[in-house]
Amino acid sequence: MSIFDRAMAQLKAMENVFGFDPTTIEQGSLEWKIMRLGVLTASKADKIVAGKDTDGRATYMAELISDIVNCNSGDESNFKQTDWGKLYEPEARTALSAALGFADIKEIPLTYKDQSMRIAVSPDGVFGNVCCEIKAPFDGTNHIKHAAFDKVKPEW
């Protein structure tokens, strides 16, 4: 069974937990934010592995607890960089699919590490048994750093 099929089966089995079909939601939707409520996510992995006595980790843990206590479903603010990414991510996914020779790079809203639902990832695409994270830099600086110097932002 592929990563995609396993992830979608896992989500479908959790439909009664959420009260909606988690296989049909999109990343960034209110339902997706609810699914991430109080969950350690790969997007903040740098905060977790930083060490237990670091400010970044302590702040992240406090945010997770606050999110649960206050039922805060995440940052609702929009940034032009986020809007840019949402606009160009499908194009980047299509280009990656063509470059790698895969007919289709599928999207998964979110998948949990296990039934505890405490750790999750939201890959931008899945093909075969590989997950990918797609970046569509807002400005050319990061793209040029990567292309010319093989530099990638640590949080990526």
Protein language model features and the residues they cover:
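Charged, glycine-rich intrinsically disordered N-terminal tails and low-complexity linkers that flank
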Residues: 1-87
